[in-house]
Amino acid sequence: MKNIELASKDLNALNVELTELLKTGFKLRMQKGTQQLTNTSQLGKNKRDIARVKTFIAQKTAQK
């Protein structure tokens, strides 16, 4: 997910994106716990994407 894509989205779309990322993160953690996750770098990427989306949500909220 690129910063340009996130900057062009409105607040509602960012909240939907955040919800999807949180669900994906939960699934990845469950796969890791059951030893089914083969690519553990997905966890870090997901965490960074969540932080990125939360940052844009905070910026959009501060602008209003």
Swiss-Prot record:
CDD domains: Ribosomal_L29_HIP (cd00427)
MF-aspect GO terms: structural constituent of ribosome
Record Pfam families: Ribosomal_L29
Any one GO CC term of the record: ribonucleoprotein complex
Record InterPro entries: Ribosomal_uL29, Ribosomal_uL29_sf
Key words of the record: Ribonucleoprotein, Ribosomal protein
Database matches in HAMAP family: Ribosomal_uL29 (MF_00374)
Record family assignment: Belongs to the universal ribosomal protein uL29 family.
Protein name stated in the entry: Large ribosomal subunit protein uL29
